[in-house]
From Swiss-Prot:
This protein's UniProt keywords: ATP-binding, DNA damage, DNA repair, DNA-binding, Nucleotide-binding
Protein name per Swiss-Prot or TrEMBL: DNA mismatch repair protein MutS
Species, as recorded: Rhodospirillum rubrum (strain ATCC 11170 / ATH 1.1.1 / DSM 467 / LMG 4362 / NCIMB 8255 / S1)
Summary of the function given for this chain in its UniProt record: This protein is involved in the repair of mismatches in DNA. It is possible that it carries out the mismatch recognition step. This protein has a weak ATPase activity.
SUPFAM superfamilies (UniProt xref): DNA repair protein MutS, domain I, DNA repair protein MutS, domain II, DNA repair protein MutS, domain III, P-loop containing nucleoside triphosphate hydrolases
Length: 929
């Protein structure tokens, strides 16, 4: 179909599916031509101010995709024009040139080569730009033969590439999911669905409105579809802010639940969706919007999608975005993977296994039975070192068949995808023997289910093994991938083709001999076909009148000829080669059909392989790092014996540092709230985080870094640890802290686990102390959850006398020769000092600053802080001169600290040792004075 005034029935604009007039391009340094209006599309004069037929075609395609940057295929390049060229040149840092003129101005143009376009495409997608790929739908030479020399090649959009619909390995992280999500609000119900187009996994979940943010934080989707009204809801502005650039608003009509239900039922061939789960209207609308959008971007095609799964409310441990960041579950605060919990525990050997592990870490379970089943699978392999090693060796390097299957279903797969599926399926018998025949008894249900999913695929493996050659091209159109002997007809055509090539070589030798030009060559290109090439200085020999050589082309240093004999031979070769390639394409289509006919079974096998990989990886981690199996039940216990921080422990080991100090944590019913005090750098934040991470690991189904752990299921995990401002939204560090604390106090339940660090810092001392005090009381009296609260406000320890479930604990230190040694041990009690000046000294503050700080601290510790601060200010000439003193009463001097210390001593009741200690204390007081 030629694009002029008409357009493809499959091509619809992405933004509401209604064409809009493209915006004018940005300045390029000189006046750039704006796109012509559709009124000139049929004017083919090509004069300045009008458009050529080719440009008319471009503008028709662009008008159908106004919100996409258009990759317009021209030969070996994807070209961009007008405002697209300006945007692409700026984003990709490539040269901006021009092609023709319109309305008295140059038309901006830039391009990227076809053979390396994936890298440029990836950069555009990361910049939040959607790209429509417009391909040539016919051979240019064929177009000229059929419709004349000036014929415009037929082009059509074959795909719209967006951040949530990627399928190519070059554009994806093999070890991470790439989700396309949809969020819908229908009346008072909120539903969310998500799909990984590269694997076909499709899931839906009902949500409370307050859980939209945590759910999106859990998925970290590449793209989110939302009704325009919901996307613009001021109440969701804060929730959606982290997803800026990834929201795709669509008209409300795309989220009609009744149309969606019919669409989904038709797609999966069922009369009702009840068999997949009790989906609500909002969930069905979200699923339907996803399917419609995927079909739109794939221009009428759909990947193989699994039947939708339903994730019920309360099925997973809810963790909000702030907590995920603070705990660095999947990436560090700096945005990198290294140093995160995921990087620490990821010992998987396949891409699918890595994705499943990340999925489980992001969404820990809340059902003790399901958690126990996962732990059984890990435990089975922990105790079987040889089986575990052989299992991992067999899985290592196993191809990613889920993504290969998705590409084949979209018509974008190649011979290597077929080979990948055959290779992975061929390993299944060995894996089954390893697990079942290991002599370890009946495998637990988790591993048994994985083995059932693996299935049996001997017939398909045999077919692919017989059909595919060892050395495979990337694309089927390149040919040469069918193994010799698989198809007799193909073998015959290849023999004819290869014989023709041998005849070409003989003809070249004969012509070189007859003309006495040893350098004469017979070459081939896509324009001239086969031709004879000689140096320009020897061309006269071939141009003799009456000779067999016919001139074809003159270049700067070569001249090209043909002969009738060569042309006839070329026709024979081309015929055989074309027929061989056509037959090979037909065989490829047949093989694809065979594979896609088994798509559901192959998808289950992919899931089984991933489950085995995750179980073996977690078992290997547990055995190597001395992790223990946790007990997870429906109680409210939280009892960790000798727990360790998994990431910090590994970092210390990598740096050959000291061994990590393990600590206990028991949030028993009579001490559900721990108030943790201790010096700076003693390890309070590490202790808080390690207990939260142990809880996450336990509920995802992993062994944990501890000697033992007993955890009653946690429904929500909250963390307020670390300090960071949010200047983009006008938030100070203190404001960010208060927002996160408010979320905790408003959303935590009795089953939640809360860790809070330094609540109240960043404002006046008494303000901060008051907020921290009230927060502790609220956690104790109102929320009644399990909580760890770290603070430097030592005054809070007084709450232990009246809050019966609050227990004070501290990080121990040892003072030795004016030095402070951090023991990193947690024990009962309360700290009386924070040793901040000591930490400042370690940080390298100037000696004069340290000395003055010690002097100020001594004065402040003597009595009332406000009067001490006044005295300190009076010591400074500026303040002393500025503050009038006349008429102000002078407060009576207080008792001298040394006199107070002496008055407190009763020598008659002291042992010799106590007397000696008292003398040392008096000397210390004298030094301070």
């Amino acid at each position: 179909m030629l694009f002029f005034a008409d357009r493809s029935p499959f091509v619809r604009p992405l933004s509401g599916y209604a064409p809009v007039t493209p915006a004018a391009p940005r300045s390029t340094g000189s006046a750039a031509a704006p796109p012509p209006s559709p009124a000139v599309l049929d004017d083919r004069s090509g004069t300045e101010g009008d458009v050529t037929p080719m440009m008319a075609q471009y503008l028709a395609v662009k008008a159908a995709h106004p919100d996409c940057l258009l990759f317009y295929r021209m030969g070996d390049f994807y070209e961009m024009f007008f405002e697209d060229a300006v945007k692409a040149a700026e984003t990709l840092d490539i040269a901006l040139t021009k092609r023709g003129r319109h309305a008295g101005a140059d038309i901006p143009m830039c391009g990227v080569p076809i053979h390396s376009h994936e890298g440029y495409l990836s950069r555009l997608i990361r910049a939040g730009i959607k790209v429509a790929i417009c391909e040539q739908m016919e051979d240019p030479a064929e177009a000229r033969r059929q419709r004349g020399y000036k014929a415009v090649v037929r082009r059509d959009v074959i795909r719209v590439v967006t951040a949530g619909t990627l399928t190519e390995d070059e554009l994806l992280d093999a070890r991470a999911h790439n989700y396309l999500a949809a969020v819908v609000r229908l009346r008072d119900a909120v539903g969310m669905a998500w799909v990984d187009v590269s694997t076909g996994d499709l899931v839906a979940q009902p949500l409370a409105e307050a859980d939209i943010g945590p759910a999106l934080a859990r998925l970290a989707p590449g793209e989110v579809l939302m009704p325009e009204k919901l996307a613009g809801d001021p109440a969701l502005r804060e929730i959606l802010a982290p997803l800026a650039g990834r929201i795709s608003p669509l008209p409300a009509s795309r989220f009609d639940s009744e149309n969606a239900r019919k669409r989904v039922e038709g797609l999966f061939g069922v009369k009702a969706l009840d068999g997949f789960g009790g989906f609500g209207r909002a969930e069905v609308a979200a699923i339907g919007a996803l399917i419609d959008y995927v079909e739109l971007t794939q221009v009428g095609r759909l990947p193989r999608l699994s039947p939708p799964r339903r994730l019920s409310l309360g099925a997973i441990l809810e963790i909000d975005g702030a907590t995920r960041r603070n705990l660095e579950l999947t990436e560090t605060l700096g945005g990198g993977r290294k140093g995160s919990l995921l990087a620490r525990i990821d010992c998987t050997v396949t891409g699918a296994g890595a994705r499943l592990l990340a999925e489980r870490l992001a969404a820990p379970l809340t059902d003790p039975a399901q958690i126990g089943a996962r732990l059984d699978g890990v435990g089975f392999l922990v105790s079987a070192e040889r089986v575990r090693g052989d299992l991992r060796d067999t899985l290592r390097g196993c191809p990613d068949i889920a993504r290969a299957l998705s590409r084949l279903s979209l018509g974008r797969g190649g011979p290597r995808d077929l080979a990948a599926i055959g290779e992975a399926l061929s390993r299944i018998p060995a894996l089954r023997v390893l697990v079942v025949g290991a002599g370890l008894g009946e495998p637990p249900t988790e591993l048994t289910a994985a083995l059932i999913d693996l299935g049996s695929h001997e017939g398909l493996v045999d077919l692919l093994g017989r059909a595919l050659d060892a050395d495979l091209p990337l694309l089927a159109r390149d040919g040469g991938f069918i193994r010799p002997g698989y198809d007799a007809g193909l073998d015959e055509l290849r023999a004819l083709r290869d014989e023709g090539r041998r005849l070409i070589a003989g003809l070249q030798a004969r012509y070189a001999s007859e003309t006495a030009i040893p350098a004469l060559k017979i070459k081939h290109n896509n324009v001239l076909g086969y031709f004879i090439e000689v140096a320009a200085g020897r061309a006269d020999k071939l141009m003799a009148a009456g000779g067999p050589f016919l001139h074809r082309q003159t270049l700067a240093s070569q001249v090209r000829f043909t002969t009738v004999e060569l042309s006839e031979l070329e026709d024979k070769i081309r015929g055989a080669a074309d027929k061989a390639l056509a037959l090979e394409q037909a065989l490829f289509a047949t093989l694809c059909a065979e594979v896609l006919g088994c798509a559901a079974d192959i998808a289950r096998a992919a899931n089984g392989l991933a489950c085995l990989d995750v179980a073996a990886a977690l078992a290997d981690l547990a055995a190597r790092e001395r992790y223990a199996r946790p007990v997870v039940d429906n109680s409210t216990a939280f009892r960790i014996h000798k727990g360790r921080h998994p990431v910090v422990e590994a970092a210390l080991a990598d740096q050959a540092g000291p061994a990590f100090v393990a600590n206990d944590c028991d949030l028993a019913p009579d001490q559900r709230l721990w108030l943790l005090t201790g010096p700076n750098m003693a390890g309070k934040s590490t202790f808080l985080r390690q207990n939260a991470l142990i809880a996450v690991l336990a509920q995802m189904g992993s062994f944990v870094p501890a000697e033992s752990a007993e955890i009653g299921v946690i429904d929500r995990l909250f963390s307020r640890v670390g300090a960071a401002d949010d200047l983009a939204r006008g938030r100070s560090t203190f404001m960010v802290e208060m927002v996160e604390t408010a979320a905790i106090l408003n959303q935590a339940t009795e089953r939640s686990l809360v860790i809070l660090d330094e609540i109240g810092r960043g404002t006046a001392t008494y303000d901060g102390l008051s907020i921290a005090w009230a927060t502790v009381e609220s956690l104790h009296d109102a929320t009644r959850c399990r909580a760890l609260f770290a603070t430097h406000y030592h005054e809070l320890t007084a709450l232990a006398s009246r809050l019966d479930r609050l227990s004070c604990h501290t990080l121990r230190i040892k003072e030795w020769k004016d030095q402070v040694v951090f023991l990193h041990e947690v024990g009962p009690g309360a700290a009386d000092r924070s040793y901040g000046i000591h930490v400042a000294k370690l940080a390298g503050l100037p000696a004069a600053v340290i000395a003055r700080a010690e002097q100020v601290l001594a004065i402040l510790e003597k009595g009332d802080a406000s009067s001490a601060a006044t005295r300190l200010a009076d010591d400074l000439p500026l303040f002393a001169a500025a503050r009038p003193r006349a008429g102000l009463p002078t407060p009576p001097p207080g008792p001298h600290p040394l006199a107070e210390a002496l008055n407190a001593i009763n020598p008659d009741e002291m042992t010799p040792r106590e007397a000696l200690d008292a003398l040392y204390r008096l000397k210390a007081v004298m030094k301070r004075e």
